[in-house]
């Protein structure tokens, strides 16, 4: 018999074929490997949404010493649409100078996860030319990374919808994110990735609901937005700006398409007011154009 002492008992078996499926958009509904703690309400499992990334800003610990020790400050969420390209909201990244993207993260307080996270620096960003900080129209950006992420059970790409395709009203989708504040020991943020299930809301219904808020009765929902949520207590503030809203692809169990990017909301899951998301299908042409402009094939995120 093999008398060698067992290695670290948390080492998982080699990933099975199932975990590394070809193509975009595969959610690991039961997580990757195993979990030691029981599932908590609203927590994503390790590796459940492998396209989910954290966007970090690199800042000096001491402003007087800009070349000294650096701190990773959490800016918001994003999604991997290609091993080297991240989709996010423009208002989080428009003014930031040095950004870094972390894929495969789950619990931000520990590095003991079974598969490591991967960090890459952002070398180029594309902000939509019509992005407007005041009203957040066209709140979309692409971040191009210094090197591709390595695909792994906890790191994968999401699919994007065909141009102008919207998820049908009532479709139950997932938003995910780590909450606000900063990465690291000082910050108060969601330590473990959170998820919230929200139904897609028809645009007219959404506009009517939003007119009952402080936006007033003449509010017009811009074509670059879509809506989801509005169920009491299902709080989309958990999903950060920039984070993906993913919806199931019909007839392909376990496969998801990114219909929205978390943009803004009024209050938080109160009074049945839906959350507002950037409409990804409506901006698919822009995404394809910018990605192809940097020599990358849009086929990676096409299903």
Curated annotation (Swiss-Prot):
Annotated SUPFAM superfamilies: Trypsin-like serine proteases (SSF50494)
GO molecular function: serine-type endopeptidase activity
Keywords, alphabetical: Disulfide bond, Secreted
Start and end residues of each Peptidase S1 domain: 36-292
Biological process terms in GO annotation: proteolysis
GO CC entries: extracellular region
Region span, Disordered: 1-24
Keyword Secreted applies: yes
One Pfam family of this chain: Trypsin
Subcellular location: Secreted
SS bond partners: 173-247, 206-227, 237-268
Major subcellular site: secreted
Family: Belongs to the peptidase S1 family.
Role played: Binds and activates processed prophenoloxidases PPO1 and PPO2 and thus is involved in the activation of the prophenoloxidase cascade probably following the recognition of pathogen-derived products. Binds the A.niger cell wall component alpha-1,3-glucan, a fungal pathogen-associated molecular pattern (PAMP) that activates the host immune response.
Oligomer status and interactors: Heterodimer.
Name of the protein in question: Phenoloxidase-activating factor 2
Organism name: Galleria mellonella
């Amino acid at each position: 018999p093999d008398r060698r002492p067992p290695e670290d008992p948390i080492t998982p078996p080699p990933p099975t074929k199932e975990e590394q499926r070809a193509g975009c958009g595969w959610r690991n509904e039961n997580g990757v490997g195993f979990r030691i703690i029981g599932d908590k309400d609203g927590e994503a499992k390790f590796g459940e949404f492998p396209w989910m990334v954290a966007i970090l800003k690199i800042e000096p610990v001491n402003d007087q010493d800009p070349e000294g020790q650096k701190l990773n400050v959490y800016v918001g969420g994003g999604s991997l649409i290609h091993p080297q390209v991240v989709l996010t909201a423009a208002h989080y990244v428009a003014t930031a100078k040095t950004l870094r993207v972390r894929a495969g993260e789950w619990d931000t307080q520990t590095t003991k996860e079974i598969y490591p996270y991967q960090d890459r620096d952002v070398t180029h960003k594309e902000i939509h030319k019509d992005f407007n900080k005041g009203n957040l129209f066209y709140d979309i950006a692409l971040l191009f990374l210094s090197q591709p992420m390595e695909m792994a059970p906890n790191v994968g790409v999401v699919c994007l919808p065909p141009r102008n395709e919207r998820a049908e009203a009532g479709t139950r989708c997932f938003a995910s994110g780590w909450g606000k504040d900063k990465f690291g020991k000082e910050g108060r943020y969601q330590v473990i990735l959170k998820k919230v299930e929200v139904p897609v809301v028809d645009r007219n219904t959404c506009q009517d609901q939003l007119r009952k808020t402080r936006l007033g009765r003449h509010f017009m929902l811009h074509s670059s937005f879509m809506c989801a949520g509005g169920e009491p207590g299902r709080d989309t503030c958990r999903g950060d700006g920039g984070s993906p809203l993913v919806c199931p692809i019909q007839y392909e169990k376990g496969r998801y398409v990114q219909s929205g990017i978390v943009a803004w909301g009024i209050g938080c899951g109160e009074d049945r007011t839906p959350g507002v998301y950037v409409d990804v299908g409506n901006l698919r042409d822009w995404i394809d154009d910018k990605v192809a402009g940097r020599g990358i094939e849009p086929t990676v995120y096409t299903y």
